[in-house]
């Protein structure tokens, strides 16, 4: 099969890319490893899995898709996201151009034919002029190695491989290793199972924020839909894809009373408002950042009555600058961790030594991972415009010059160093969650509008690229 564009991945990015490329006259096709659309939402069915970007921003902004779709909650769960992608498929007729259960094992660019040669796990060969990798940042799951893990006689399951049919945890001893977003969501569900004895191994503190989950009526959404166009525009123009009316002054220009009142308002709103609505210097001024942590700790400590657990989950000393690691949204995480049937282990002090047939052994005693759709749409729009430009100018292939790549890398790292992100080295933002991986900023921290400006300015001419016009003609 031969296409103008081959897209790898059938999540938000792949679906929107296929739709936009079709509109621009390209023949396009998606190769999807799973059996359905949805990407991360097709793969994840673990207890409590749900989106942490609030309605209506975590969806495609296409009117033909949202006009007949109604969300049931402010933060929809994985089952509802699966139904949403079924709806997207029905409206946009995505599946007619998708190869499901197909894994790409190789992709090479043939300079003679100026085409990509893509090989799948079945041996099928696909060719295309352009290749779009819409695989997302969570496609490859990380499973740490532990001595003796193969000896364990119980069930070991990575959340991304949690069976759709579920696992019966009633009256079971359960261990959760990790306290990131997935760990938080699993704890909130598993800790409440009848007869469960839960042990949670915590490596890094999670400065989790209140979700403020609630049901949303169809009437409320119908009212919101009248201003969806404005809301989506505000989201696109915002730094993180989630609009918030934050203050324009720096922290030191405010009084304690003014700060506390504003933070209380953000806290009541829930979601990521406590982060996106902060004073302008919170990622630059360490003292301003410390004040935010102290407020968070004050609001959170009272929810954990057990002093040993409280010292692990809400330490007196700020563990890292707030906002430099993605905070998780929680509903009753701290109350669940405080339950008598839940044990909390600080693995920095009591590390995991090995696994045995019956469980996990620590060093001192045995005991039982931006609002994506908004950003994705803008990236796809940029890519589509770029491919149209190449087609109009009859350009066969294009590749960034090494000097341009190095300049971009330095730009990304320079912004990182100028902010308090440089003081936190355990975040997945810098690859800190993978042992042995080089620690460097993996995200552009200048915000979505500036990122797109950089992209468009960098491609307004071909000075940063090696360009081929017609096969074999380098410019």
List each model region and its residues.
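Aromatic pocket-lining residues of Rossmann-like dinucleotide-binding sites
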Residues: 21, 189-190
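Residues forming the flavin
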Residues: 173-189
């Amino acid at each position: 099969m031969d296409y103008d564009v081959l897209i790898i991945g059938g999540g938000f990015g792949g679906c929107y890319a296929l739709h936009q490329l079709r509109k621009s006259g390209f023949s396009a096709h998606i190769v999807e490893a799973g059996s359905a659309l949805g990407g991360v939402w097709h793969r994840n069915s673990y207890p409590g899995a749900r989106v942490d970007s609030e309605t209506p921003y975590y969806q495609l902004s296409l009117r033909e898709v949202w006009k007949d779709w109604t969300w049931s909650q402010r933060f929809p769960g994985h089952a509802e996201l699966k139904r949403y992608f079924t709806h997207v498929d029905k409206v946009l007729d995505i599946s007619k151009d998708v190869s499901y259960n197909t894994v790409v094992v190789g992709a090479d660019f043939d300079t003679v034919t100026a085409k990509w040669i893509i090989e799948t796990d079945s041996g099928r060969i696909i060719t295309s002029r352009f290749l779009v990798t819409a695989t997302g940042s969570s496609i490859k799951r990380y499973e740490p190695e532990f001595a003796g893990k193969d000896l364990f006689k119980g069930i070991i399951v990575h959340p991304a491989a949690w069976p759709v049919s579920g696992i019966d945890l009633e009256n079971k001893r359960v261990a959760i290793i990790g306290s990131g977003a997935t760990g938080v969501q699993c704890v909130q569900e598993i800790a409440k199972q009848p007869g469960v004895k839960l042990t949670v191994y915590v490596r890094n503190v999670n400065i989790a924020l209140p979700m403020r989950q609630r049901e949303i009526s169809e009437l409320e959404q119908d009212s919101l839909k009248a201003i969806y166009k404005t809301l989506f525009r505000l989201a696109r123009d915002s730094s993180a894809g989630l609009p918030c009316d934050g203050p324009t002054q720096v922290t030191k220009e405010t009084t304690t009373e003014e700060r506390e009142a504003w933070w209380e308002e953000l806290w009541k709103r829930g979601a990521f408002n406590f982060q996106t609505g902060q004073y302008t210097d919170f990622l630059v001024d360490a003292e301003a950042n410390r004040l935010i942590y102290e407020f968070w700790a004050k609001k959170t400590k009272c929810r954990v009555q057990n002093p040993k657990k409280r010292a692990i989950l809400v330490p007196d000393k700020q563990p890292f600058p707030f906002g430099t690691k993605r905070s998780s949204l929680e509903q009753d995480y701290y109350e669940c961790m405080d339950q008598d049937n839940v044990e909390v282990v600080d693995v920095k002090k009591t590390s995991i030594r090995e696994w045995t047939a019956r469980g996990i052994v620590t060093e001192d005693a045995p005991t039982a991972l931006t609002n994506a759709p908004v950003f994705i749409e803008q990236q796809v729009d940029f890519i589509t415009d770029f491919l149209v430009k190449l087609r109009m100018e009859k350009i066969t292939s294009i590749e960034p010059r090494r000097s341009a790549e190095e300049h971009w890398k330095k730009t990304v790292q320079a912004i990182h160093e100028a902010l308090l992100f440089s003081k936190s080295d355990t975040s997945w933002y810098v690859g800190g969650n993978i042992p042995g991986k080089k620690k460097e900023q993996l995200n552009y921290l200048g915000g979505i509008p500036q990122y797109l400006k950089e992209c468009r300015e960098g491609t307004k001419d071909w000075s940063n690229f090696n360009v081929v016009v017609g096969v074999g003609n380098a410019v």
